[in-house]
Amino acid sequence: MGDPASSSTWVAKKVPSDSEISDNLSWRNVSVSQVQAAPKIYEQNIRLSGSMYDDPLFNYFRDDTDDQWTRTTDFTPSASIGQSYILCLELPHICYLPNIREYFVYYEVHNDIFNLQPGYSYSSNTCFVPVVKSHYFTDVPYEILFKINHLVQNGTLSGPTLDDNFYRLVSPGYERIDRIKRALEKMSYLKKTCLNPTNWLSEQYKKMRRSRVLTSPNITLDDDGLVYVYRVQITPAKVYFYGPEINVSNRVVRNYAADLDNFLRISFVDEDCEKLRSTDLSQRSAPGNNTRRTALYNRVLSVLSNGITIGDKHFDFLAFSSSQLRDNSAWMFASRPGLSASDIREWMGNFRNIRNVAKYAARLGQSFSSSTETLKVHKYEVKEAPDVTNGTEYVFSDGIGTISADFADEVSKKCNLTRFTPSAFQIRYGGYKGVVAIDPTSQWKLSLRKSMSKFQSDNITLDVLAYSKYQPCFLNRQLITLLSTLGVIDSIFELKQQEAVQQLNRMVAEPQAAIDAIELMPMGEITNIVKELLLCGYRPDVEPYVSMLLQTFRASKLLELKTRSRIFVPKGRAMMGCLDETRTLKYGQVFIQASNSADDRGKSVVTGKVIVAKNPCIHPGDIRILQAVHSPLLGHMVNCVVFPQLGPRPHPNECSGSDLDGDIYFVSWDPDLIPTRMVAPMDYTPAPTETLDHDVMIEEVHEYFTNYIVNESLGIIANAHVVFADRQSLKAESTQCIKLAELFSIAVDYPKTGVPAQIPHELHVKEYPDFMEKLDRATYVSEGVIGKLYREIKKQNPHIRHFTKDVATLSYDTDLIVDGYQDYITEAVWFKEEYDFKLGNLMEHYGINSEAEIISGCILKMAKNFTKKSDADAIRLAVKSLRKEARSWFSEMGSDESGDGHKALVAKASAWYHVTYHPQYWGCYNEGYDHRPHLISFPWCVYDKLILIKQKKNIARKMLDLQNRMRRNTILG
């Protein structure tokens, strides 16, 4: 039924309209449910027979095994289901009813009487509900209207209450727009529906006029690489508006920055925010095995074909990146005079010679990859280098070129990299995509190969997507399964997991263990903050900020061990693949030079046997055992795995059919993990593609996107492989697993080829191992290595200590209090309120429970309409931007750090600490947000100032101790 909040059974009396006759007046049993989302709607072809049990009135159980129910959309004429938060269902008197208590947490039986009153549709159209728009005589800006729709869709506002007075109150002609935005933002965190929004807004405006409103409720962005983007989720029965949300920009939105509000990200999800299943869009009937498109298929295709209207803007389909396609997401654009979605596609490049729909769609999406704009490179500064085939059918240089050392330094600076210059960059340049690695001998800024060219484009800006750097590596269930298949014994993995757990347990109690752990497994921007705090004497089990971050880090790693068997491998790295341009490496050899830790202190060349793999990997031949050798000519290559360009077949292609256009490889030189045998790699030659006899039309791209949802089978194949590898004696070498590996390769290539994988009936599974935690399916206790690891890690307790008033009393550090801090208390309280407001909004927006999770990026759980995989970067960037904004508030008083200016800065930092940590301020920033915890990350935005204070106090204490010892020694002497 879709996330029920509560349910009750009532005796209802229907109130007829004047036109109804009195005979219709009747008493009825009804079930009333309050829902947070629309229910999943099913339909059934009615059987015609004389039996009363075939009557639709009595045949209402969806799980009847004799019937096939099909997913459908809102069947009511005015789309009433999608506009309703209370559902009233009439219950037949003479039919057996299920035990409703089993399905609803909050359930009551009432004998009261309530009256059903006629309702009406309040949505501006019935295709997308609920969507409202302002009345024609009231000017409400798009950003305000978007927020109002969000409030209606999450139940904070009731659509029928939005009258002329309401729209007048949210018009810039009545109130300042920053106050309107702030009031609506505050409204979105009310825990119940605001039934009188005009009064509520009026009261909020009065409070704001009396108080100091510092900034917009949105986090300030002063980084050219970040943008705010609006997002819409479309379900079978409803739509949900989100944002604006912080995103890394891409080539397209940077070029059309003035039209940012005309871009929209859409995604298609089910009512419970899970991905749509292929069977929801297309059902296969038994006779003749024919497929039938459902109403959900038509809804997705209709949205892509016809667009979506929000206020005065009509958004049309634009394109989608490869990652968006996997997430069933796409970009849309609202045309304006002189610029349409078609115009933008024309600007992106010339795609007319691409006659395959899947490839055409992929090339359109190439420009939408999140990237950092660097420098312009003129065509005469680019060399066209030949590809390396080595006389074989393979392209050894597939996706890789070179960059000169000097130009690499310039690009690094544009990427804000000051400590090192990466050895390789993943790039987009014009119609080229792939990797460029440093060539110390090259005088050309860029040397690009034909395999990197995907379409024609006049764009000459070099965009960077990623670069080579220190990256820790981890085992996962697929790697463990393959290594186990190849002979690595179970006890090895059990020992590795035990060592990882011991390291996590030590880091929350021992300072040096914590420093070592976060250097090997960094937590992003806050790694240095935690490290500096530990180095200046704070203990990981005492200081609340450090403690909560490390405990959350531990909890997240334990969760990864439990759900993914993600075991840290110290003797290994995740590395970008590159090509040996010197031709010194032989087939079977690789060059590996790795940084020792995240801060790039020292590096070492690996020699000896190594294993190399590329995730995802499910064929035993995907694990390659190679020989790492030292090659002086490749000494400039750091944190890359360099493959030879010699031999019968490229090693990257042997690893899951990979290439060198930016893929990251698992590399380990741990002798315990190197199998005693290696099997032949699988043939990853892609299926032949269909070539059209005409230019690809955008309507064909719409259909391809929709068919992708129908045919996408990677998850099904991967899950089936897990089950068969766990149950079969040959593990991943079993007949079933080898066949699934072949199908998996076809499914991986589907976005490029358009050829779907067809899974035979005998490879479908009905029972799952316990470690997959499929609570709604039949399960068994796994006797394999993954099952053993899973049950062992379940014994660990991911305890996280919370910041309470008692903790505040015990942990308040008087060392951080300096003379003059009182002068900045009032200002510090203002800034603390602002910071907490924005950070709390982020936490609630993404459904993140704790401050430590959002600050560290170690998110344990989030709202179902977001995923860690897709949204982790946006969250990290939002927090980074907020910290940067807070530092700008701190610097408002000036940047003079000498003499009195320095004293003022440390006094201000001291005040920030005091209003956060002192017990008298505990909980005082939550007015109107009683459900929010007391947040403590605010003062650590200026951690460098606080650490200076702490270090000075430490030095003074040491000097005093030294003087006392000398005095005692003098007396004793």
Give, region by region, the residue ranges found by the protein language model.
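Beta-strand-enriched accessory nucleic-acid recognition/scaffold domains that flank the catalytic cores
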Residues: G2-G657, I664, S668-G973
